[in-house]
């Protein structure tokens, strides 16, 4: 009896739905009362199935935990959830200047490219010296949150306030290989001077050995074998114009030269103080590429004045620096030009944080070998100060730095002492060191030790200003105070 009644009621409902003007659709609540279904997420079988994004979060509204079951990764889940919960905040591409947008809940984050900052990377970052050297060609310093560029002596600042230009035919710090003309500048930096006694004793010292070896203390002769290491020997030949600042100190007895030097301007040569103990009288040759051949580019200059640092220590090689004033000025040309002197702060922050510097000279090709007849150059990496200190039992003072290879058989050797260590920055070479000493030549685990030029820039400058007036007949040894 009950069944026919239910059927009758169903017919009435259906008939009423089909009457004209009545909708064939009913709302969700009424429909659920008519056709009920079990939601899959609540069933036992659904819970044990692996998460499915479409089933969990598209067909149904899901929770963060359900989305996490699908991605099984917090970062990916968060990235999806931020968009799922309130839409993609990055859809409008709010980040400017190629910034990368990351969506968040009700917000977004921009990761800006170098040189931009701000919420939307809309702000241009001021380029200070730590970023691309402030776009300066040479020296850079910061002043009132802005960059001030300047140039080495012999250059002037361009109209852009960044570039360094020169009208000199051979400016300092420029290699002249393949160039018809280049220029030089009387390069100076910050430095100081003073005088001292006549040249001390004329003991013959052996450059680039350790201080104690020079004094015959704990002297050990290296074993001669076929594996003798090669240093600037292991380097490459300097072609014409590649090492124009190289000078060679030689005596009548040592025509091949006993030490090197760096041309700073037409009158001054930078060298090592310990070189002054190897000959009572010597001359300076510039423009030489091969000591056995003359090509017309060599020039010999007599020394008018010798300026040695009065704190030079012969037992430790601390303050190993000296200046030579020439009687006649150097004529600069393709193969003869000075290296630039840097500014102290800029050099220590920028130059000496470069990966490598360059040394050159006529030094021995092996630890116990002969002097090289040709001028050689070699790129040597700067060595961390702590690493260098741990490599030797000798003192590495604040006036020294280390460069070279731990195992590679290349180094500076005897005869290279006093020679240039220069560092390149934007095609300009600046003096950064003086070849001073080392334990043997290119021994494994040992590095070359160099006088740190930035520690003496004021001394150098004042030394070059110390002597005014006509030259004297005999060389004089003066001594600027530090």
Curated annotation (Swiss-Prot):
- SS bond partners: 57-62, 90-101, 95-110, 112-121, 129-140, 136-149, 151-164, 172-340, 238-243, 259-275, 388-402, 413-441
Q: How is its activity regulated?
A: Inhibited by SERPINA5.
**What processes in GO biological process is this protein linked to?**
blood coagulation; positive regulation of TOR signaling; proteolysis
Instruction: Return the InterPro entries for the record.
Output: Coagulation_fac-like_Gla_dom, EGF-like_Ca-bd_dom, EGF-like_dom, EGF-type_Asp/Asn_hydroxyl_site, EGF_Ca-bd_CS, GLA-like_dom_SF, GLA_domain, Pept_S1A_FX
**Cellular location of this protein?**
Secreted
List each copy of the EGF-like domain by range. 86-122, 125-165
Record PTM (3R)-3-hydroxyaspartate, positions in chain: 103
Question: What Gene3D superfamilies does the annotation carry?
Answer: Coagulation Factor IX, Laminin, Trypsin-like serine proteases
Identify this protein by name: Coagulation factor X
User: Which organism does this record belong to?
Assistant: Rattus norvegicus
């Amino acid at each position: 009896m009950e069944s026919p009644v239910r059927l009758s009621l169903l017919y009435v409902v259906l008939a009423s739905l089909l009457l004209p003007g009545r909708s064939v659709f009913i709302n969700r609540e009424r429909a659920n009362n008519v056709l009920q279904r079990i939601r899959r997420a609540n069933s036992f079988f659904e819970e044990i199935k692996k998460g499915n994004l479409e089933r969990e979060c598209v067909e149904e509204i899901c929770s963060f935990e359900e989305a996490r079951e699908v991605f099984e990764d917090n970062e990916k889940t968060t990235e999806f959830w931020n968009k799922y919960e309130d839409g993609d905040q990055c859809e409008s591409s709010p980040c400017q200047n190629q910034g990368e947008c990351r969506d968040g809940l009700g917000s977004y984050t921009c990761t800006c490219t170098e040189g931009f900052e701000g919420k939307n990377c809309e702000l241009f970052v001021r380029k200070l010296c730590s970023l691309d050297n402030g776009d300066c060609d040479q020296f850079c310093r910061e002043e009132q949150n802005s960059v001030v560029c300047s140039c080495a002596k012999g250059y002037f600042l361009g109209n852009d306030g960044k570039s360094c230009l020169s009208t000199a035919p051979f400016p300092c710090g420029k290699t002249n290989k393949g160039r018809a003309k280049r220029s030089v500048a009387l390069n100076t930096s910050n430095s100081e001077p003073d005088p001292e006694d006549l040249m001390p004793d004329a003991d013959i010292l052996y450059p680039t050995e350790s201080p104690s070896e020079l004094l015959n203390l704990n002297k050990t002769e290296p074993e001669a074998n076929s594996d003798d290491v090669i240093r600037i020997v292991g380097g490459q030949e300097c072609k014409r114009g590649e090492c124009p600042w190289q000078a060679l100190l030689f005596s009548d007895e040592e025509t091949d030269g006993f030490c090197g030097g760096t041309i700073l301007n037409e009158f001054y040569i930078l060298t090592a103080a310990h070189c002054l103990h190897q000959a009572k009288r010597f001359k300076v040759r510039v423009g030489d590429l091969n000591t056995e051949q003359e090509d017309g580019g060599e020039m010999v200059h007599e020394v008018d004045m010798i300026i040695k640092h009065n704190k030079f220590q012969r037992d430790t090689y601390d303050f190993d620096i000296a200046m030579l004033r020439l009687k006649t000025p150097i004529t600069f040309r393709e193969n003869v030009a000075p290296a630039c002197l840097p500014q102290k702060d800029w050099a220590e922050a920028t130059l000496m944080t470069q990966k490598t510097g360059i040394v050159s000279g006529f030094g021995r090709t092996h630890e116990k070998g002969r002097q090289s007849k040709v001028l050689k150059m070699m790129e040597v990496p700067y060595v961390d100060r702590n690493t260098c200190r741990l490599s030797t039992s000798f003192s590495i003072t604040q006036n020294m730095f280390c460069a070279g290879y731990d195992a590679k058989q290349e180094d500076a050797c005897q005869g290279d002492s006093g020679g240039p260590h220069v560092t390149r920055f934007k095609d300009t070479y600046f003096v950064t060191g003086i070849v001073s000493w080392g334990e043997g030549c290119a021994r494994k685990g040992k590095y070359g030790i160099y006088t740190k030029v930035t520690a003496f820039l004021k001394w150098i400058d004042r030394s070059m200003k110390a002597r005014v007036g006509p030259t004297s007949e005999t060389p004089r040894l003066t001594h600027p105070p530090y």
